[in-house]
Amino acid sequence: MTSLSAKIQDVFDEPACDTNRGKDAKARKEGCSKPLTPGASAGGCAFDGAKIVLQPITDVAHLVHAPLACEGNSWDNRGAASSGPTLWRTSFTTDLTELDIVMGQGERKLFKAIREIKETYAPPAVFVYSTCVTALIGDDIEAVCKRAAEKFGLAVVPINAPGLAGSKNLGNKLAAEALLDHVIGTVEPDDAGPYDINILGEFNLSGEFWLVKPLLDRLGIRVRACIPGDARYIDVASAHRARAAMMVCSSALINLARKMEERWDIPYFEGSFYGITDTSEALRNIAELLVRKGADAEILDRTETLIAEQEAIAWKKLEAYRRRLQGKRVLLNTGGVKSWSVVHALMEIGMEIVGTSVKKSTVEDKERIKRILKDENHMFEQMAARDLYAMLSKHKADIMLSGGRTQFVALKAKTPWLDINQERQHPYAGYDGMVELVRQIDLAIHNPIWGQVREPAPWDCQPAREDDLASAKNGTATVNAFNEFAGAMAHRFGDR
């Protein structure tokens, strides 16, 4: 745990973060995230954060050294997608029991599990995750991984990020440190070129990076490694030979980008593929960085030509939606990079942002929101479900974009809702992704079901019926009138 403590302190000292630089030594040791409330929600620990960052590496066997619940509770917490290997969809755990812990069999069981994975699946690497239990009982996973790597002839990488170490964000950064210490730089590619880039902090949710990669392909830009979305182990291992990098989610992997620049002189910038303007700006920045690193300057002209073509196509598709969505009010209850990138994207088509959550956003994210919205009145750290319901039930927003945890608040308030977090089913990146996002918003807002659910329920109309019945003398008179009507009708039909 001594090495883990040292690694945590190193992660908390981040020169690439101006906010971190502005803190004193005591505040820096506390990290960026607020302390967790035990039992408040599932996930959110350092182990969960490490698993989020590394599991999308698709051809690696991810082995959790823990009781079964640790793997079960963290399973499938990101809707990443793979274009090839499916090994990452197989769950591996040592399934420690009380007897294993009491008898000190943890390390031996881990070694046997690595051997079984090697013999059955033959992956290029095995990532071994420590957890609270194995950290507390003192299992030395680094020693076991080193011994297994020598014995079986494959990369066995220790991921020392037990849940008790801290927040999910800390786990993201500890996972990045594991890649830097054990993976990146271990393979020398034989095809490195002047147009190779890395994409950092892109998780390929719902396969959305596949909407961006064709644009880079048309420019002759090769993605050496997308970390972690749809990645392969050998791509990550050779990522140190890229010429430039784009950071998509700095709150998760800023330490990875900064240290790769220090060690291998790979310049990076932070950008977004959400929205037309941001996608175009990201392509320009990538081209400019490559030119600075020696690529032919003609790529700048080709980039502008591609941007003009794609923007024209996208705006033509969006024109029909603009008329239907102009002035519609949106509440964003998300965080991180989406707190500003999606805001910018929606404002491009004339939608009004009534609020955006900054709970998981960095100080830099908040500054971007201020510049986009021109003030900070629409930013909120956290909104209780009761306040959220009150806002939506008073029709202060036409739609809410959030994750699954708050969808039922919107549905209870009879307000359209769209999933925009990691569980989403549709890709929203790039030019085509922007069109898809707007299409989904339009479908949600103009779904005819909302007109029906907002109508008064039949039982809510009961008082009016009682008023009508009150005009009769009493219940008996009503029955008599009905009997007279029935008799008259029977007599009429009988006459025929």
Swiss-Prot record:
Keywords: Nitrogen fixation. One of its GO terms (molecular function) is nitrogenase activity. It holds the Pfam family Oxidored_nitro. The keyword Nuclease does not apply. GO terms for biological process: nitrogen fixation; protein-containing complex assembly. Disulfide bonds: none annotated. Pathway: Cofactor biosynthesis; Fe-Mo cofactor biosynthesis. InterPro entries: Nase/OxRdtase_comp1, Nase_comp1_CS, NifE, NifE-like. Belongs to the NifD/NifK/NifE/NifN family. This protein may play a role in the biosynthesis of the prosthetic group of nitrogenase (FeMo cofactor). This is Nitrogenase iron-molybdenum cofactor biosynthesis protein NifE. It comes from Mesorhizobium japonicum (strain LMG 29417 / CECT 9101 / MAFF 303099) (Mesorhizobium loti (strain MAFF 303099)). The lineage of its organism: Bacteria, Pseudomonadati, Pseudomonadota, Alphaproteobacteria, Hyphomicrobiales. The gene is nifE.
